[in-house]
Amino acid sequence: MKFFALFIYRPVATILLSVAITLCGILGFRMLPVAPLPQVDFPVIMVSASLPGASPETMASSVATPLERSLGRIAGVSEMTSSSSLGSTRIILQFDFDRDINGAARDVQAAINAAQSLLPSGMPSRPTYRKANPSDAPIMILTLTSDTYSQGELYDFASTQLAPTISQIDGVGDVDVGGSSLPAVRVGLNPQALFNQGVSLDDVRTAVSNANVRKPQGALEDGTHRWQIQTNDELKTAAEYQPLIIHYNNGGAVRLGDVATVTDSVQDVRNAGMTNAKPAILLMIRKLPEANIIQTVDSIRAKLPELQETIPAAIDLQIAQDRSPTIRASLEEVEQTLIISVALVILVVFLFLRSGRATIIPAVSVPVSLIGTFAAMYLCGFSLNNLSLMALTIATGFVVDDAIVVLENIARHLEAGMKPLQAALQGTREVGFTVLSMSLSLVAVFLPLLLMGGLPGRLLREFTVTLSVAIGISLLVSLTLTPMMCGWMLKASKPREQKRLRGFGRMLVALQQGYGKSLKWVLNHTRLVGVVLLGTIALNIWLYISIPKTFFPEQDTGVLMGGIQADQSISFQAMRGKLQDFMKIIRDDPAVDNVTGFTGGSRVNSGMMFITLKPRDERSETAQQIIDRLRVKLAKEPGANLFLMAVQDIRVGGRQSNASYQYTLLSDDLAALREWEPKIRKKLATLPELADVNSDQQDNGAEMNLVYDRDTMARLGIDVQAANSLLNNAFGQRQISTIYQPMNQYKVVMEVDPRYTQDISALEKMFVINNEGKAIPLSYFAKWQPANAPLSVNHQGLSAASTISFNLPTGKSLSDASAAIDRAMTQLGVPSTVRGSFAGTAQVFQETMNSQVILIIAAIATVYIVLGILYESYVHPLTILSTLPSAGVGALLALELFNAPFSLIALIGIMLLIGIVKKNAIMMVDFALEAQRHGNLTPQEAIFQACLLRFRPIMMTTLAALFGALPLVLSGGDGSELRHPLGITIVGGLVMSQLLTLYTTPVVYLFFDRLRLRFSRKPKQTVTE
């Protein structure tokens, strides 16, 4: 009583306290960062190593394995995967959430140093690492195009000037430059001319290397002067290499230009990048795992004018893709939804109270509670994201509940003729415990979520804490500001209604009277209601088991990623043509705004595409509908497949794949893995629950297998090293010398001119100079035949691995796909030597599925404990919790009706319903107990009176919560796929709960009261005590 009086009779102090809360909230709001979702990125580090010309199997055994053994000893590594292809190895380390990425980076560097002695000596550089996840979609893609400069020159500008500067921007984790390679002098050898001149490929390599040398020459001095010695020992351009003498034949000089075509070209000609059908260099920017995407993008944009000034005017620097516009648009949609929710909730209060003065009170208390929450969010290090803003939207219905309960009870006393200040004090005292019980039991629902580990726990933490803080501030405001405003603003007389609202008032009275009559009938037929309650419990279980489930709603971020997978024996020229063909098909789609892509590098038969869709208000289809439409057109392209997927804000795992979900096969027997992977992939491709099934197992590449006749080689005076050196010189794009320039270093690359390597007959033109100086054709001591060879070798941990990726067809859920895969694996009879498990997002979904039921039970148990403590009773909490089954049925039925799978967002809705619907029962039980103790009423009379007296506030609180959630259901635009499941769950649960709990709660109350009397030996003595 004294606590409430302190604020009611000191209005200035109460107002200033509320103003202080509001000002702190406004300040916190201005300083809060913006993000699509809470920070849930796993710390990921990528280790890269190269050995030019080495086969994938050689890279896996001699480079990947030693590094994996050393890196695997690092503490906190949750997953380690590697992929080895021609000349390169990439190892992805994913760490536990609580692992500091900078400390992990130091451990990674130490592990690389420890493995250095076990790595091949021919590696051109030490392995390097980056603090970025290569499987993440870039947050921004920049393109360089020019009609004047070559692709190599553009790549040089991008990698030498732009990429290092961008990498220094806060939040940037990696800048990957693609579409070409650094400039280089290329020496294209003519095998026939070499043979005619008696010059070996090693002779050319040695001559070029010796002609371009950068060594210190020293200085000359006399008594008074000093001269630095400088020579023309370096060759910089193709024109300078052309006249280089490499050999003498019969006294005549053989120059490099006589046996080769020397050009200013690029280091690797098997690279191509494009943007909207125009050749381009791509700068793909990824953020650090802990960085804020909006802040990072804004920092990059602010740097762009400076970057443009560092490159020539003839080079066009453009933003081809930017993830931030859709994120900003999504947050604007949520903010609008929040404002609409507040307006609807205030409208509900106005309709029920039919008083402008009374409506002003929640119209003030609700914003104070919501705005004050921003200060706590800032102190907790949170961000303004879809989930935290949705928490505030839902909180609108909660925070007004507290004000409604207090306001309605005070208004009831005023209508009875009590003076305003007395009514405020008396009314607040009566419902103070009710409001406290409602708020504490609601916060108790979220305690299990706060203790939840892994990605789901991290994802829901901001939502949970934000909502709990809003409820806490609302509790304070409803017991301080609300009664003070009631006492000083409301009048003792019954408010005069406007004519247009009298109809609503009469309808409410009629509803209350009708409810009273139906409740009497129900209380006389309690067994029927008991059967209905048991039926809802059984229906809950059946619906939960049968409803499709997924991890997180599929988002439409306005960005698609595409992975091209062509025949494993395809040439680079043909692959570049496939890239152009696919880009044309996609560019012609009316919903597409921009297309960029690249191919080449160590994997000739693959490519990547990044597609920016038009804004949501300029297209009628969702991203998935656009993918479905394009899938039909892309399937007509022969010789290659393009797999599209919508970029998601949450992506788990470091392995790059061509689809959203992964199923990984592991085995210590590589032969068994290669035997069973095609069988499993073909089986999964037939399942209707899966789409775009593909695999990263590339073991069917074309190979030319050379078999040396060692006896013949010995007789001819040729060793294996000379033969291997010949092949590397001819076909390996061998880097034979380095050109030093002020800003960068460039290579001299030697190989047989591509004009002479169009078919297998090129091998017949190769020869080796033996120890007697004679030219011996390769065909004299070697035989060759076509064979198959892997294009890549993948590991997970230290086991061989193949990952099958898949998307979900329209209308299918991740639970459908998971169950179908499990059935298929059982039907195939896969041996125990091959182990299958879900990876990435699918793995997190499996883990979440196993904990969902436990989480719901834990929430109910927590609420029971809190209510038991508050009521000092084992029974009354059960009465209150009896409202939950009907809410569960309503939520699950609503999801089924809207074809929405049960996701993590829907789980939040279920948890919220546990907190919302029990409020009705709390108000009934509180007043019934009060009537029994002080009104000398029987339990049936008490609960009947409580139901009628609390009918108006129950309807108000339920409709307030319903209207607060309704904008989530009806909202469109960016991010609506996240809001819809939450709104559908809450609205469906509230509607069903409101229809049933008004009748089931009093029946359950009477049932437990009779049960208590039956088992109580001395009820009278207990009452006396």
UniProtKB/Swiss-Prot annotation:
Pfam families (UniProt xref): ACR_tran
Annotated keywords: Cell inner membrane, Cell membrane, Membrane, Transmembrane, Transmembrane helix, Transport
Cited SUPFAM superfamilies: Multidrug efflux transporter AcrB pore domain, PN1, PN2, PC1 and PC2 subdomains (SSF82693), Multidrug efflux transporter AcrB TolC docking domain, DN and DC subdomains (SSF82714), Multidrug efflux transporter AcrB transmembrane domain (SSF82866)
Q: May I ask which residue range the UniProt record assigns to the signal sequence?
A: none
Q: Which residues form a coiled coil?
A: none
Stimuli inducing this protein: The mdtABC operon is transcriptionally activated by BaeR.
Provide one Gene Ontology cellular component: plasma membrane
- Classify the main location: membrane
Oligomer status and interactors: Part of a tripartite efflux system composed of MdtA, MdtB and MdtC. MdtC forms a heteromultimer with MdtB.
Enumerate the PANTHER family for this protein. Answer: MULTIDRUG RESISTANCE PROTEIN MDTC, PTHR32063
Functional summary from the UniProt entry: The MdtABC tripartite complex confers resistance against novobiocin and deoxycholate.
Q: Which family does it belong to?
A: Belongs to the resistance-nodulation-cell division (RND) (TC 2.A.6) family. MdtC subfamily.
Query: What is the protein named?
Result: Multidrug resistance protein MdtC
Q: Which organism is it from?
A: Escherichia coli O9:H4 (strain HS)
Q: Gene symbol?
A: mdtC
